[in-house]
Amino acid sequence: MIYKLRDLLGVDELGGTMRLGRYACDLAPGSVARRIYGQDQIWERHRHRFEFNCLYEPTLAQNGMKVSGRSPDGKFVEIAELPSHPWFVAVQFHPEFQSKPLKPHPLFASFVEASYRHKTGGRGQEAVGSRVQVGHL
């Protein structure tokens, strides 16, 4: 389902061939990712040579997985999620590159929030995405 970037197929010398840097990602309406970020488009950092094989997308969609983030040109799947799961969000980028101890990345904050809700049976104040405050939980 994940393979080497199509632009690199047949390339053996991989020096300088990564998808590297900051790229835009359009978020699907009604998706978990859109709720977490609270916006239509995000910018995230990449450092990889791999991409999602879109030939598998119909089969995965039939089994509940939703592509919820794509590059603006539609070429790359950036985020996939399982809407039926309490918190299943898979990303192609590196959210840790934009996370700080006192300002966690929205994905990390949302994951901690979902974990807290799971542990407490949903009790406690909800804090979504980047609005989580350190020490709040």
Identify the meaning behind each predicted range.
Residues M1-L137:
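Amide-donor transfer/coupling interface in amidating biosynthetic enzymes
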